[in-house]
């Protein structure tokens, strides 16, 4: 193999893309990963890091450009870590995400008879985020800055806009930056673990336009809070809720457990088709409302509900998918380990007049067995776990329960694939549909259908 050393300048042809969106050039089968390089491009690159099994390169020149390359519209793209794929056409992004899923389920796990559908994309893949979490800091001139983190760092890029956030959010961000400066509000400095204002969080109802503004502070005492609220209301008189969240931990967790309502309601309302949901500052609620409706409609299609089925909604959160399915089912049982989420789910069931739902707080694998003793046997199980996937004990419980169908939504196809291999003992993976919940990024969500063999 050719010698490869740091600072070498080399040329080559990109033969693949990684799941992180990096181009792959190979020298005698040795892979070099190069951010922002695209398949079939002939490039010049510099080696910046060499490891035992791979190297990292920096793109210097593109000698032959891919037909899928586009100009990134964001002026912060080269520095910001929020997006990874703005230089790739949207059609090619959707194809790349499908290839990721094919690679995981067919090439690696050998689910050769399982259908992988095309990625479900957006008509307009911008301005889709209904929740923004914006760090606050100071620059070297001691000026207030707000924006998002530089790639692979906690250095804040001072920004005036973000093209994947709701446009209202950037208006709020810019106004808040001015207010914090004018009122001389103390700003949290992560390295020193000192200061007050840590993050600004903004949530909007996609269909209702209700808006919640949350100030995350390092402690409860905030002398200027009344003045800040007054200025916010002057600038945004239609705001639904203003809250203070207290996070005095020294971790990377954005929000703490305690919140105080400074103005308006404790929650905002949003809708998904015919269902209405109450959302608090802490609620898990899908970031992309337009794509969530497509994702849930595909889940209902997979569930094949006729109105006679008992559905078990595990990892149910605030009840979104369970309540979405309730009009099509005989009864929906939801289970979630977070008490506040179950309270929200129960309230959302009342709001939607869903009398055929039951929501219980607890570990799914334990509650399922309790229900089994009570004679409750689901026909369909909905699974929507966090990124780490399902606990193995939960998978084993499902295998003993033997529902006719399992519909598995995942925000991490790698752990979904791992769980699919465990379910394969009794279940046939029929098909997987990727859904693009986060355009311009490498993230892909999937919904999969498993039928009992």
Where are the regions that the model predicts?
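Short, aliphatic-rich beta-strand segments
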Residues: 202, 209-218, 276-280, 380
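Short, solvent-exposed loop/turn elements at beta->coil junctions and helix N-caps
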Residues: 117-125, 190-191, 199, 203, ...
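Extended interfacial segments that mediate partner engagement and assembly in macromolecular machines
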Residues: 60-72, 79-187, 207, 222
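Short, conserved phosphate/pyrophosphate- and ester-handling motifs at nucleotide-, phospho-/glycolipid
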Residues: 40, 165, 288
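Short, acidic/hydrophobic/Gly-rich beta-strand patch recurrent on exposed beta strands
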Residues: 23-28, 147-150, 214-216, 345
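Hydrophobic beta-strand signal
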Residues: 44-46, 133, 312
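Rossmann-like S-adenosyl-L-methionine
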Residues: 2-11, 16-19, 224-453
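Terminal RNA-binding accessory module
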Residues: 1-76, 366
